[in-house]
Swiss-Prot record:
Region (N-terminal hotdog fold): 616-750
Coiled coil: none
This protein's name: Highly reducing polyketide synthase
Lineage: Eukaryota, Fungi, Dikarya, Ascomycota, Pezizomycotina
Organism: Didymella fabae (Leaf and pod spot disease fungus)
Region spans: Dehydratase (DH) domain: 618-924
Amino acid sequence: MPSTDSSTKGTQDVAIVGLSCRFSGSATSANKFWDMLCNGESGHSETPRFNPKGFSDPGFRKQNQSATAYGHFLQQDVGAFDSRFFGITPEEALAMDPQQRMMLEVAYEAFENAGMTIEQLAGSRTSCFIGSFTSDYREMLFRDADAAPRYTVTGTGVSMLANRVSWFFDLRGPSVALNTACSSSLVALHLARRSLQSGEADIAIVGGTNLMLGSEMFTFFSNLNFLSRDGLSRSFDASGEGYGRGEGVAAVILKRVDDAIQDNDNIRAVVRGTSTNQDGKTKAITLPSLDAQIDLIRSAYKEGGLSFNDTTYFEAHGTGTRRGDPVELEAISKTLCVDRPTNSKIIVGSVKSNVGHTEATAGLAGIIKAIYMLEKGIIPATINYSRPLPEFDLNSSLLTIPVETKPWPGTSVRRISINSFGFGGANAHAVLDDAPSYLASKSLGNGTKDANSNAPVLRTNGSLVNGNGANEDVQTSTEQLSFLFSGQDQQSLDRNFETMVQHIQTKSFSDSRSELQYLVDLAYTLSERRSRFKVRAEVVASSVTQLVSKIQERSFARVNNDLANTKKSIPAEERTCELKRRVLVDLPAYSWDHSSTYWAESRVSKEFRLRKHPQRSLIGAPQPSYGENEHIWRGYLRLSEEPWVKDHQVLGAIVYPAAGYIAMAIEAAQDIADKGRKVSRYNLRDVQFQAAAVIKEDVPLELIIQMRPHRSATRSTATSWLEFSISSCHNEKNLRDNCFGLLSIEYESSQDSSMALEQEREDALVLDKHRRTAEVCHTTQSPKALYQELASVGLNYGEAFQQISEISKTDGLSSCRVLSYVPDRFSTPNVIHPATLDCMIQTIFPALSGNHTPIHAAMVPTLLEEMSVASRTPNAAASFFRGSASARYSGAREMLAEFAMVDQDNKLSVTARGLHCTAISEATNPRTEQDEDGRRNICSQLMWVPATGVDSVEQVQNKATAPTQTFPPHDQDILILEGDHAYATALSDALMSLDQGKGSYIPIPKSFLRASLQDLEGKTCIATLEMGTSFLANAATDGFDTLKEIVRRCSRIIWVSSSTEPIGSVITGLARTMRNENAGLVFRTLQVPSQDMYDSENLAEVVSQLAASPTMDSEFRLEGGVLRVSRVLRDTKTDNMVASMARNGGPEIRLSTLSQVGTAQKLALPRLGMLDEIYFEADETANGLLRDEEVEIEVKASGVNFRDVLVVMGNVSDDLIGHEASGIISRVGSKVTSFRVGDRVCAIGHGCHRSVYRSTADLVHKIPDGMSFEEAATVPLVYTTAYTAIIDLARAQKGQSILIHAAAGGVGLAAIQIAIHLGLEIFATVSSEPKRQLLHDHGVMEDHIFNSRDISFAKGIMRTTTGRGVDIVLNSLAGEQLRQSWHCLAPFGNFVEIGIKDIITNSSLDMSPFAKDATFTAFEVINIMHKDPKRMANILRNVFQLLGNRSVKPVKPLLSKPISEVGEALRLLQAGKHMGKVALTWDRGQTIPMATTVVKPVLSDTATYVLVGGFGGLGQSIARMFADRGARHLCILSRSGARSREAVETINKLENQGVQVQSLACDVSDEGSLRTAFETCKIEMPPIRGVIQGAMVLRDISFEKMSHNQWHEALKPKVDGTWNLHKLMLRDLDFFIILSSFMGIFGSRTQGNYAAAGAYQDALAHHRRSQGLKAVSLDLGLMRDVSAFSKKEALSGPFKDWQEPFGLREVDVHGLLDHVIASEMTAPSTIPAQILTGFGTAREAEEAGIEPPYYLEDPRFSLLHTTIVEAQQDTATQQQPAATPPDLVAKHTTGDLLRQATSTEDVTDLVLEILIVKVAKHLEQNVANIDPEEPLYTYGVDSLVAIEFRNWIMKEFAADIALLDITAEEPMFDLVDKIVAKSKFLSVPS
């Protein structure tokens, strides 16, 4: 870097000779810009360009929301433009970007300021470099391209910014428009300077433009956190959080210095150096580079040969960001401050604090500021600065920030550096010197003259020469001067006069000489250095006063063009002085004609720009509407902005909740509500939830809501209701309708109005029902249990959707407390938040589950009939609601519910009625292993197998296990820790007699044990301390400490104890923990029955082998001389029973023969429309008393109808199927006289698919002789329907015409026969050619048969009837086909609707046909049967009268199938290709799937049940369960009694249920205390029939650190307490259940005492069983929702990981207890004495993503150790196909083909091929027409068909796919991937 400036004469330096600018606020010109800076003012304001309230979010957290409503804006109308001046037509001006227009005006002003005329510029080598960044006008026009003006391409093209200037001024140099973002104009300056230096141009104009016309860039910059919230730029201040945007248009004119001097131009400043560079690869593209900025500054100074030390001021980029400002200050410090004197600080400022960041114009804003600073010698303050940045130590640097305006320091050269950075890394720098010092250093002159300058007048010879700049000495004279003014028209001239007068009047002069100088300069400037326009005027004056006066008086002479073109404007007859004539630089610019504005904005764009509301969290932002009173909102839901949505997961997918759609509709309604009235509530009705909106983690979901007045008619508009629809799109391809419905806004009315009174009464009824519901709900449920239950079926609710805090319930009802969900502070407030509303909806689930009945499937809302939401719903953090709900199952897969919520003031907040929820899955738990039926594997059993035959036993289980081997003993001494009993002495003697090789057995008597502990170190010890006696359980402190020393010192322990007494198992439990706490310890236990202890010699052999064996096993038992080891096995049988109990007595399906069943059967509904899973169950109704008016029919046949299909598929809510049957009367009621046993009859009814059917006699009819049972079973429904429609309702008369739709079906064929009988002209529709032929065979004329697949039949009917139509329509079609049929009616016609689709969907009906006096009637025979059975009986009689006289016959064709093929029969109807009727025969001997129902136990209301430890979480749950099972007397024992709030509440609720509760404080480990408690209980309560022992004390600590007291505290309640219960409760019990723990099975670390106690309890259960007493020990695993471990934070270590995947739910424990109690109440018991639960497998751990449990290292658990990979390998091995003959290949199943695949790609291709074939078959199209890139729903796979597809996928691929996956917006490829991932057939390499 040079230390001094180069000063050679003749230079290529570039001068700035003219400028113009327009900035925000008062800075409407360059002079006013300088005034703003000096006065410390700001152009900051709220945005006038768009409605800031529509785009800014005060919370600033939503994407595409503006962080600010403020900026720095031009005061002028940006649409105003002087188009005539530039010769631009209005049409073209309309299309021009205001940046182009303003650039033209500013360019002219800059040329004018430089003294350059249009004439001089024309054809000149002038280059034009214009920098820009944003194009808001272009974006505005592009918002609505259809409305764009003709010249849009030239008007908005960015290149035109430069080209337009070059074109107008006829500039012939380079013309470049450039965009380097915020550095654009300074880069343009650099390029312009280069063009001058290279000689390709002689003049250059540099421009920059930045207008902020739209909101888009505000929002996009906000996305990247660029903008400050208050719209201010706080340059270098610690409070800076971003920059404030600013508008500005500026231009400067450049010339080479030599040329400027030669042309007598103003040299405002000299550009000494420029440079540009790029940041390169930084951490992010918008982050600055310190190194690049340092290089940038150095390059500029090096290029100019400049010294850093001469620079006093640095005009920094200084946007006010915490990332950019510190880096820039550091770069300045590391360049200009190097080797700088410490007393010469660099002053750093930024113009952005005044006018904001003008982006593309920012560089020129800094340049113009710097020019004025150089000229004026003043440094303006940097405003908005108070505290230095903490990231840069300003105080220790040589930098300072000016906080007040001050003069330039010193008198030397004035030099300024200017920085400008682009946000993409394009940087620019310029160095300016003041003109005087520069010219002085070069010995050059300057032609600059400020009109305020008082520079001395050079004396000359008295000649005043016209504008050549020569210096001649003359004498002073009073000669008058001529001033030339011009304009494009008279108005322009007048405006120029006015601005000039205003300017001149601001001048003051110190003497006449300075006034004369000013006048000479003014005359020179106006005459020679300004463009001359066609309207001109000459003013002659000799003084300023005279000049002003003449202008104001318009005293001037018109000037013709000839005169104007001469250089005679300044008279020179008398030359009195010579003055150097200079161009004045501060004269007012040309006065533009801004009377016209040009703004080509469409309505659509304007509505967007001026929208009233911003994007909000639910509905997004308002959109332009396309209809009167239509409103549209659109937004993008991003999980990063709305994280609460992630907490709503259905079947593993994030699904937008139904409550969200309701909340959206309410928010939209709030937007358009009458602001002059108070809203009371929002009412919704007929809300249909359609396709689910699935949200992906990183893909925003587009949501659109439309709202308009509800058009209930096509010729009018009803305004009381608004119809809304919500759509979504997540793949930028397909929009899907998610929800639609109706909403009305209810406003507050006067309290005495009829509406208010009625509403008050209605609310009172709801509140009363709410109160009564709360009173009857006594069963409590923990919210955690509810949410885990919901998660088990696939409704995975996270924190935001877990706001239910209290639950009480009974069958069908619930009462809950719901907290108001409050999102974080950035979210916009809602009338009601979706999470809050969703949790209100969730209260229906406890009502549905009732008294501990689990929820079987994931159910989601599909229809809401009515809802009301109060407008002032509480949403504060502490607010909550109390609600009541009722719910019931309605059909196979639907629930019907309602609920009401009140706030804390007991005011109604939300009510809902007719909430329909539909099942979309079965109960599953994806995080736990399940069998094929979806049941959870929670139970295990402990099995003892021979130690020598382990392998062969376990081969039966198809698993391997650790071998059990024996080896010769080690050559070492073995110590015998000898007990006192004779058994111990005998064993000791026997051991010592054995040949031990080099070692020997050394006995240590018990009495010497304490003194010999040091001899145990590292030894093998055989402990006989508990042979025949108890050492451990009752050990005193010394004995306990001795035990601890034994365990600590010995390396190998073989402990022998009794298996006959339970106390001998204490050491077994402790040893399990010891092995887990000390991995190096070998601690083996041997349990020996008392009878085997006599054979000491054989026992010694066994013990000797165990002492030396390297076996991995540690627990042994000697039984009958056989040594055994234990293994833990899955207990599938118990699992199945528990699952059945948990399913409220669900079925187990077994094949049975119809004749062998021995009881009546009925067809049961399968799950979720699984036609292949239809089964039969016992018909309990057949066992009840036959009513007096009933008959009993032994069914021989039953008819199948399409309604059966709809019920099974879940599309019609019903619990039973089958509506017609035939058979033989088997019994008659006492009042029945018309039938006898043995009569052949048929019946119409409900649930007729059963072997024995009961019906009232009125609905039964004898069948004629000769009519088969199959025929008779097909008569009732179809004929009663046809008869009712045609004869009863339509009142058909002979000669009338009838249109029968779907005429080839059962009803259609029956209707044809009745119509023929009545003599009607028949028109009919069918769907295929075979059906057409069938009708023709039935006598329908060929030209009267039409197609039912489209609406062509309507044209055919009207054509055939010559426009009259038909008299009767029997309709079963829907939608447009119904509408067309309705319009086919003749005058006075009758339309009879027997379909239900349009009724279910609440479709609208055209009213205009009623003008023809038409009648529309709808009915369903089933409803007549239920509601008017007498009428139904009469119809049935009339039908059989027709059949009897052979007027009609049973419907043909008739397809008969055995009842065992009912699934196939239903599927046939589902396909829609059958003709006639289908009947099922009930012949005995058929094989049917029969369910054996498990019945939950019923507890006696005359017995007492004892619950020990009944006030813990699990104890209270069991108490409630017992009450639900019928118990009415409970004795609850606990150490402290019912002291806790929860215990008291539990007792109160039990007593409210009618349960007598005796709560006694009792220590069960104290036999006396327990006996007293039982005596008290016997006095006040019935006999005790059952005991639950759940007492426990936890004292967790490692055994090494455990005290004697801690040992006994844990043992006493379980060991002593359970023994005492055993002693006192020996006989007369229905059950004795011990709640032990799985921790006693594997030996939980730090719980040796607890494990020992648990092992004792297990042994005691076996002991009681051996004595013929009731007993079961349940080793319960971790609880997920209740008990001491209900809160996950209470668990430590691996238990935290195990709880969720392996833990038990409350419903599991209840199911287990139900099973145990039911089994124990039988004699003998059918279950083992010990049941293990809660043990997870390695595979389950792998699926859960956790480490395998450490207990799996124990050989006892080897059968649970199989991983997923091992399981797949085993499966692959077992399923390896044998060689297949070629002729059998075609018979391979899909499973075979998939298993044979060799790669994932092959499997995927195969599955896709099969799926496409299925879709093509469904559509009856060619396979080639199916595009796998499209979602399934695009091929008509709606919710009904989706069920079929799901069932097909399950059957074909063994893959359980959710309905959401089938109806999702994803392409078929994605569905195929899911099938491949879930198929049980697959085991393919990756």
